[in-house]
C-alpha cells in the first residue's frame, strides 16, 4: 500500500516525535505483564527515531478504565520497555496535564517520555479534537504504530492527524508491516489459500467470511461458531452455542461456497460436556450424536485429523479464532493441535491477533508462524475489505 506515508518518507532529524503505540498488554492479578509481544513490536520504530536524533513521546491505552486507577497505569509498561531498550523511560503522571507538558517541553534528543494511559482522558475514545490538539502541540511529528487500534476513530489515532501535514505524519514499521501482510494476503496469496476461522460467534466474523469466500480455495470453520452452521445443515447440536438469528446467513455462506467451488469444512466430531468447566465430565462424540443438554466445547480427534489433511497442501493459511474454549485446559487440545499443524507446514501462515495469538503463544509455536498480527479487530476489518480510520488518515492525498 504505497500511498500510505511511511516513517521513512519523513525528515525526522532532531525532531520531537509522538509515537502512538499499542501497549495494551495482558497482566496478571499482580499487574505483571504476561505477554510483551506488543511492546517488543514497537521497538524498531522507537529505535529508528532515536537513531535520527529525535526526542520521543510514546502514548498508548491499556484496558478500558472507567476512571483513573493505578490498575490501568502504564508504569509496568515503562519498566518493561526500559529493560528491552536498556534505556531510561521518563514516565508522565498524566496525559495532557502539567506533569506531562513540563516533561515533554524539557525532553532532550535521545530521551523517551511515556504518557500515562490515554483512556484516562474521557475524550480519547470520543475522537475529541481538543484532546488531539493538546497532544499534537507537544511535538513536531506524528507516527502511528498502533495497528491494534487503527479500526477505531480515537483522538490519538484519527483526530490528531488533522494537526500535521503530510511531511510530518506517517506510519511506523509495525503498522506498515501489518497492512502489507493483509493486502498481499487478499490480493496475491500463494495457492492453495486456506482460511481457518473459529471463535465463538458467527456475528463477529460474518463480514470476513463473506469477503473471504471468493478469495480462498478452502474454508475451515471451527470453534463455537461452527454449531450455527451445523444447525443450519439440520444437525441436532444439544445445548451448544447457537445464534438462531444467523441460521439463514450461515446457509447463504454454505450455498455461496458451493456456487464458487470453495469446499467448506466443519467439525465431524466434538468434545462434549454438560457444562463449560474444567471438572465437567466429557466425551468425544460425532456431531450428529451430541447428547441432549450437552454442548460441544472443542473439536474432536477426527476433526483434528480431517483439518490436518485439509491444510496439508496449503501454500497460504490465514487463521482467526480458536477451535474451542481454549481458556479451559481440557477444551484447548483442538486449538493447540491446529496451531502445531499450521506452524509445522510450509505455508505462509498469518495469524489474526487476539485469542488466536494467545493460542499460538500457549502452544509454543509463535516463532514458527510467518506473521502474527498484533490486532484482532483491526486485522479482521482489513480482511473484510474495510478502510481503517487510523490508516486512512495517513494516506497521501496526491494519490487520490
UniProtKB/Swiss-Prot annotation:
Gene Ontology terms: cellular component: cytosol
CDD domains: Phosphoglycerate_kinase
Binding site for substrate: 22-24, 38, 61-64, 119, 152
Key words of the record: ATP-binding, Cytoplasm, Glycolysis, Kinase, Nucleotide-binding, Transferase
Subcellular location(s) per record: Cytoplasm
Top-level division of the source organism's lineage: Bacteria
Pathway: Carbohydrate degradation; glycolysis; pyruvate from D-glyceraldehyde 3-phosphate: step 2/5
Pfam families found in the cross-reference section: PGK
Reactions the enzyme catalyzes: (2R)-3-phosphoglycerate + ATP = (2R)-3-phospho-glyceroyl phosphate + ADP
Main location: cytoplasm
Signal peptide limits: none
Binding site for ATP: 205, 296, 327, 353-356
Record EC number: 2.7.2.3
Recorded GO MF terms: ADP binding; ATP binding; phosphoglycerate kinase activity
GO biological process: gluconeogenesis; glycolytic process
InterPro entries for the chain: Phosphoglycerate_kinase, Phosphoglycerate_kinase_CS, Phosphoglycerate_kinase_N, Phosphoglycerate_kinase_sf
SUPFAM superfamilies: Phosphoglycerate kinase
PANTHER family: PHOSPHOGLYCERATE KINASE, PHOSPHOGLYCERATE KINASE 1, CHLOROPLASTIC-RELATED
Family the UniProt entry places it in: Belongs to the phosphoglycerate kinase family.
Subunit composition and interactions: Monomer.
UniProt-recorded name of the protein: Phosphoglycerate kinase
Source organism of the structure: Campylobacter jejuni (strain RM1221)
